From Swiss-Prot:
GO terms for molecular function: ion channel inhibitor activity; sodium channel regulator activity; toxin activity. The lineage of its organism: Eukaryota, Metazoa, Ecdysozoa, Arthropoda, Chelicerata. Keywords: Disulfide bond, Ion channel impairing toxin, Neurotoxin, Secreted, Signal, Toxin, Voltage-gated sodium channel impairing toxin. CDD domains: neurotoxins_LC_scorpion. PROSITE patterns: LCN_CSAB. Excitatory insect toxins induce a spastic paralysis. They bind voltage-independently at site-4 of sodium channels (Nav) and shift the voltage of activation toward more negative potentials thereby affecting sodium channel activation and promoting spontaneous and repetitive firing. Residues 1-18 form the signal peptide. This is Beta-insect excitatory toxin LqhIT1d. It comes from Leiurus hebraeus.
Length: 88
């Protein structure tokens, strides 16, 4: 019973503190364009406060963005490609 109550308390907190991945956008709704990973890592960590970033399909893909950051709406195929590239 104690485990169940603990689970009910921790589950909402995990949802609030979650991070997301995606192409972070500026105030104009555009993601930074890129050719090299080091540019994206700098852009994502310093401008958008993500954990890291890299170049995927000529746009900066940020990993570990806060939930309140806006990301570019993309197809599931493109997102899967960038997530797959990240983990391989």
């Amino acid at each position: 019973m104690k485990f169940f109550l603990l689970f009910l308390v921790v589950l909402p907190i995990m949802g609030v503190l979650g991070k997301k991945n995606g192409f972070a956008v500026d105030s104009n709704g555009k993601a930074p364009e890129c050719f090299f990973d080091h540019y994206c890592n700098s852009e994502c960590t310093k401008v958008y406060y993500a954990e890291k970033g890299y170049c995927c399909t000529l746009s900066c893909y940020c990993v570990g963005l806060d939930d309140d950051k806006k990301v570019l709406d993309i197809s599931d195929t493109r997102k899967k490609l960038c997530d797959f590239t990240l983990f391989n």
